[in-house]
Amino acid sequence: IRNSEKQHIWVGMARETAHQLGTPVSALMGWVDWLRENPEKTLDIVEEMNADLNRLNQVSERFSQMGSTPKLEETDLSELVKTVVDYLEKRLPSKGKSLKLVNEITSKTNIYANITLLSWAIENIIKNGIDAITQERGEVRIRLRMEKEEVRIQIHDDGKGVEKKDLKNVFRPGFSTKNRGWGLGLSLTQRIIQDIHRGKIFIKQSSPGSGTTFEIILPT
């Protein structure tokens, strides 16, 4: 790798780390403000604050596992997705927007996975969908289809969609259409799915104004 490319990757990783820290830190600040206004409801919020503290710990774990050989273990995919959705649902942008996460994966589905990294990959796709919704109302829907020796996870958002000219670049390190993006989230997601879980990830459908559907294929 050329020095300029190495520098770009290091800068991108540093910024991606800051981006990963942003959600739990912002949430913790929000919970503190909420507690100041509602001191009688402390117990209701402690669990969510604890979830954000755990998330801060997960950020370092995620990056350390990317630099090692992660272990795969038998995992209930439905429970993994539910945990990701439950966390993000309580932290959806609310100012001027009405957003929904719809999780249609309910039946137990066992696969071999690294829970920390696969959760990160699915979270990245869902957050990408949330960011793509620029209108007042929108949703991100998660579905699962079982086939012979694989599972197919579809994550669809009804956001702005991807321009045809950009489709081939979405997983390229450094590519981003977001003003605050650094273009490593989807690149890391692709590596987690393909290199670590021996799966596939691609955009199944997308066009401006009609949203985007990502599909993840994982062996069972």
Name each region found by the language model.
Residues 44-94, 98:
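Conserved DHp (HisKA) dimerization/phosphotransfer helix of two-component histidine kinases, i.e.
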Residues 68-71, 110-113, 177:
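Conserved micro-motifs of the catalytic ATP-binding
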Residues 98-110:
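Conserved catalytic submotifs in the C-terminal HATPase_c
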Residues 139-149:
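Short beta-strand/loop element within the Bergerat-fold HATPase_c
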Residues 157:
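Acidic ATP/Mg2+-coordinating residue in the GHKL
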Residues 162-174:
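Short conserved segment of the HATPase_c
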Residues 193-194:
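Detector for a conserved hydrophobic position within an alpha-helical segment of the HATPase_c
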Residues 197-205:
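Glycine-rich ATP-binding loops of the HATPase_c
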